[in-house]
């Protein structure tokens, strides 16, 4: 029986004795040994040794050749063969993918790697160190950790194994809601310091910044603090009591007025410091923490003060140029009877949120009733759009804080449609096959966390960030079971999928095509519900943000299928279920088009609208917000807030495939402009940290959503 040879890259090829003979002859020529018969004999002996086996490793063959040569009469030939093998290994390594990617990083020539994440400044050493570690982690995971069919599917672009530079090499998870309340009230240990419950709002926000930095260094996705205004309200009370006590000790006549004034100032300063801290931090991942603050539901005066402080600081901007802060992402909750309409007690806070959104794009809004309807309970998204389902502890209490998402695998839907060649039945068959593969890939994320001990991430598992206080040698996997954690199937390109399958009319303009798009997402939802039932894990459907993926999938599909009109011709794929960015509709109709999808993909979603400058037309923006309240759970506002520090222009810079330029003076010096765009769910500063080519093209093609006589 002739064996198969397992090569270094994992491929299997038929065994051929001729290749052994050729390698020995090349070494013989280098050693000036003129004995072809001897070389043929050695090759024959080694071939005989390999017979009868199913599979042999390439290194076994080479070692057998070396042993045979060293026992023969030509020692110089043995030496030449060993040197030849060594030189070949070095040359192969230089040509290898790992070496090429490292060289692309060191020489700053690999644009796709350098611009993969708009939040990472690949020009600085800490980020380069993280990128280098990521290159190695990806390589090792592909070669040694993941099943071969999963790796091949990822490489082809059938699926995308997100964050392969971190997981599964490291036992890390994606995003989470920090149990900040538990940590601050019970105390915790961080590094060498024992942290006691803070005695003021300024101390509480300082500690919060350190918690964010630590947590963000132990996970690879977004870090969210849910209902931060309510969590930190007791520390505002503590500050007030401290200032009141000072006033009484010093016999200040209006002790209450003094305490109020000092508390307002301290709270504003505390959240200013927190915003600066977040935007100047670099985590161990080489980036500013992807952090989100959810707020808006608090009714106490302390919670209201926190809400105002967060919004007024964001409006004020960062530094001498008052730049728009990219982080934290702000998510403002709106609830009827609280802050939704005139007469509601916190309606004034909503007005401040509208002003902030018109000037700084954030906050995005969470519509309370819709969030509960779609996800089962109210909570802030983890990161930019990942939503947890309902989970109750042993006491029957709904718990959100301390929970997390284990990771995402995304499907390339347009590729399936292209492979189906317009045949809908073939599409559904291929989709079911890909779903089997996606589930297998997702299960590797779960398996990677089995047997992992709490000591690998004390801040998460031992000090309360995950809502638990485990011992160092406790297994962490138990806290991810029974739906406590989510794990998500993602998808991209509903728009291109419909085009590839049916062509012709735009999906927006055809009710039947709309129904086809919804049906695809319904099938994905059925799959994750089935997986959840079968495994007990919290499988969910997630509308992938696709900052990098919009470019990668399209690039791979263009190489495979060519430039296909309406599919691969733009250089990017449309984000999840979103309306084509070039389709000119009003914001209300865009909401209506996208509204059917969040209830299906309730593990992750966002809707947004593109607007002109609306700083002097807040009523128009409020009208859209109010419309969204009845239709979608989560809504974002994109509006031009670019600034030129050369000529003073404010508004929207010209977006080209090469970058952004001031329309007034032509300035495109990144150090003399401020450009802010929504990357996916987060904002980014593409002037300083460029988007990848596909995302840049998508941003360039975005049109404003105008109409109904309200906007524009």
Curated annotation (Swiss-Prot):
The modification Glycine radical is found at residue 681. Pfam families: ATP-cone (PF03477), NRDD (PF13597). It is an enzyme of class 1 (oxidoreductase). GO terms for cellular component: anaerobic ribonucleoside-triphosphate reductase complex. Its EC number is 1.1.98.6. GO terms for molecular function: ATP binding; dATP binding; dGTP binding; pyrimidine deoxyribonucleotide binding; ribonucleoside-triphosphate reductase (thioredoxin) activity; zinc ion binding. It catalyses: a ribonucleoside 5'-triphosphate + formate + H(+) = a 2'-deoxyribonucleoside 5'-triphosphate + CO2 + H2O; formate + ATP + H(+) = dATP + CO2 + H2O; CTP + formate + H(+) = dCTP + CO2 + H2O; GTP + formate + H(+) = dGTP + CO2 + H2O. Residues 3-92 form the ATP-cone domain. Induction: Induced 2-fold by hydroxyurea. Changing residue 647 to A: Almost loss of activity. InterPro entries: ATP-cone_dom, Form_AcTrfase_GR_CS, Gly_radical, NrdD. Residues 583-708 form the Glycine radical domain. Activated under anaerobic conditions by NrdG, a tightly associated activase. Activation involves the formation of a glycyl radical at Gly-681. Exposure of the activated reductase to oxygen leads to C-terminal truncation and inactivation of the protein, by cleavage at the N-terminal side of Gly-681. The presence of zinc protects the protein from proteolysis and prevents the formation of disulfide bridges within it. Changing residue 644 to A: Loss of activity. Catalyzes the conversion of ribonucleotides into deoxyribonucleotides, which are required for DNA synthesis and repair. Can reduce each of the four common ribonucleoside triphosphates. The glycyl radical is involved in generation of a transient thiyl (sulfanyl) radical on a cysteine residue, which attacks the substrate, forming a ribonucleotide 3'-radical, followed by water loss to form a ketyl (alpha-oxoalkyl) radical. The ketyl radical gains an electron from a cysteine residue and a proton from formic acid, forming 3'-keto-deoxyribonucleotide and generating a thiosulfuranyl radical bridge between methionine and cysteine residues. Oxidation of formate by the thiosulfuranyl radical results in the release of CO(2) and regeneration of the thiyl radical. Modulators bind to two classes of sites, one that binds ATP and dATP and regulates pyrimidine ribonucleotide reduction ('pyrimidine site'), the other that binds dATP, dGTP, and dTTP and regulates purine ribonucleotide reduction ('purine site'). NCBIfam families: NrdD (TIGR02487), PRK09263.1 (NF006732). Belongs to the anaerobic ribonucleoside-triphosphate reductase family. This is Anaerobic ribonucleoside-triphosphate reductase.
